[in-house]
Amino acid sequence: MRFLMFVCVDETLGMTEADDTVEQWLAETARRDVRREGHQLRGPDDATTVRDHGALITDGPFADTKEWIGGYDILDCATREEAIEIASKHPLARFGAIELRPFWEE
């Protein structure tokens, strides 16, 4: 089962402790061969929202929130439980939230 894993960070919390352990998480997912892709994303100040077939385009932050999507990973796991276990070990889970969404596959 493939899952899109959103890494949501809270800018009000310090994240320096997580920097060292991300490499450990990446090594573990490589060892288990479950991570297919992943990248950090730029912050909400660089975001663009497009609606109504391109007629409405908005740049910049959109919501008065301190939590935003800071990155994503694509996981390919045997079960949902395995995906949850792997996501729960991501170091940024301590500084925000990890959201898992299964791919729509038949």
Segment roles from a protein language model:
Residues 1-106:
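Conserved, structured core segments of small domains
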